[in-house]
C-alpha cells in the first residue's frame, strides 16, 4: 500500500526578484567570467535531465548576494534545498534571457549549497522553445562573489529517472511538449540539500573557451545574453476544488480541498477525477510514500470527450464541460 497526497501547488517567488536595474554595468558591456557548463560526455541536444551543485562556505550571512542565472532549455535553482528561481523566460538565441535575483535571504553563515536542475526536451521540446544546446549558467553580480560563477569547479551528474511521454491520447496537432515519466527507483533524493554527498559526481566541463557574452559583445557561446524584462511568474498554492468521480476507493469528504492522507491497499487500482471548476495554469505536486512498484498516472484535460477519440470517423465532441457522466478523459499525461 502507499499513501498519497494530491494538489495543485504553485510557489510565490516574491521578495527577491531584482530586475535589470540591479545589474552590474560591467556585465552588460563585457564578457562574463562565468562559463556555460555541461555534464561531460553527454549529448548536447538530446533529451536529458542534468543536476549541478556548488558548495561554498561563508564567514557570515550576506546582506545582499545578487546573481544572474540562465539555462537551456530551462532550469530550477535551489539554495540550501529551497526552490528560488524557475527560468529563463523564453526567447530566441539572439535575445537569450537571464534572471536576476538576490539569494542572500536563503544563505547562512557556514556551509551553503547552490544547486540546479536543467532539462532539455531535445527533439520533442515545445514548438515555442528555441534552443542552442543543453547548458547552465550562473554569474555573480559582484566580483567578490565570483566563487559562485559556473565553471569546472561545479559538480554535476545526469538524472536518469526521467523519460518523455509522447502524445495526448489521440491524433491532433499538438506541439506543447511531452509529458513526463519518472522511475523513482532511479531517482536521486535530496540532491539539492546541504547534506547530500556529491563526492562521486563529476566536475562540470565548460562549454567552449569563452565566458558567457552579453548581446552586442559577441555570440561565441551561442547565446546572446539579455536581462529578462519580466518578473518571475507568480506561483502560489492552489488546491483542487472537488472530486467529480471515483472508482475503487472511498475518498474522505475533506479531499481534495483539505490536505488529506489516502491509503491505497497493495494490488489495488483506483482512479478519481478532480475538477478545479475554472481554468488555471499550475504544476501538480504529489506527496507519497511506500507502494514499491506502484504506478501513479496523471491525465490533464480542459474538458472530457463524449467518446474515446481514438479512431477514424470520431468527431472529438466534448459538449458541456461541466458534465462528466459517461465521458472519457484524454490528454497530456505524467506518470
Task: Label every model-predicted segment.
Residues 1-25:
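Bacterial Sec-dependent N-terminal signal peptides
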Residues 22-335:
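Extracellular/oxidizing-compartment recognition motifs
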Amino acid at each position: 500500500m502507499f499513501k498519497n497526497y494530491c494538489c495543485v501547488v504553485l510557489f510565490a517567488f516574491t521578495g527577491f526578484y531584482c530586475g535589470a536595474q540591479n545589474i552590474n554595468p560591467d556585465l552588460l558591456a563585457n564578457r562574463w567570467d562565468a562559463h556555460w557548463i555541461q555534464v561531460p560526455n553527454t549529448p548536447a541536444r538530446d533529451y536529458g535531465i542534468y543536476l549541478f551543485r556548488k558548495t561554498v562556505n561563508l564567514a557570515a550571512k550576506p546582506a545582499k548576494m545578487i546573481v544572474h542565472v540562465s539555462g537551456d532549455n530551462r532550469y530550477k535553482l535551489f539554495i540550501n534545498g529551497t526552490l528560488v528561481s524557475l527560468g529563463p523566460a523564453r526567447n530566441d538565441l539572439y535575445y537569450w534571457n537571464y534572471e536576476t535575483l538576490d539569494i542572500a535571504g536563503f544563505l547562512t553563515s557556514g556551509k551553503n549549497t547552490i544547486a540546479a536542475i536543467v532539462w532539455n526536451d531535445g527533439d520533442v521540446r515545445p514548438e515555442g522553445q528555441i534552443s542552442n544546446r543543453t547548458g547552465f549558467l550562473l554569474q555573480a553580480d559582484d566580483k567578490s562573489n565570483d566563487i559562485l560563477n559556473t565553471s569546472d569547479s561545479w559538480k554535476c551528474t545526469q538524472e536518469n529517472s526521467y523519460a518523455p511521454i509522447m502524445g495526448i491520447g489521440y491524433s491532433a496537432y499538438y506541439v506543447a511538449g511531452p509529458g513526463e515519466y519518472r522511475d523513482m527507483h532511479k531517482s536521486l533524493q535530496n540532491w539539492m540539500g546541504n547534506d547530500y554527498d556529491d563526492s562521486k559526481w563529476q566536475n562540470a566541463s565548460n562549454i567552449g573557451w569563452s565566458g558567457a557574452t552579453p548581446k552586442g559583445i559577441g555570440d561565441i557561446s551561442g547565446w546572446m545574453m539579455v536581462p529578462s524584462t519580466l518578473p518571475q511568474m507568480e506561483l502560489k498554492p492552489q488546491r483542487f476544488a472537488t472530486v467529480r468521480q471515483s472508482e475503487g476507493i472511498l475518498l474522505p469528504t475533506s479531499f481534495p480541498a483539505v490536505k488529506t492522507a489516502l491509503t491505497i491497499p497493495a494490488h489495488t487500482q483506483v482512479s478519481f477525477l478532480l475538477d478545479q471548476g475554472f481554468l488555471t495554469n499550475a504544476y501538480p505536486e504529489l506527496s507519497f510514500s511506500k507502494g514499491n512498484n506502484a504506478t501513479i498516472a496523471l491525465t490533464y484535460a480542459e474538458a472530457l470527450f463524449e467518446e474515446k477519440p481514438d479512431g477514424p470517423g470520431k468527431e472529438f465532441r466534448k459538449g458541456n464541460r461541466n458534465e462528466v457522466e459517461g465521458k472519457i478523459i484524454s490528454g497530456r499525461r505524467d506518470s
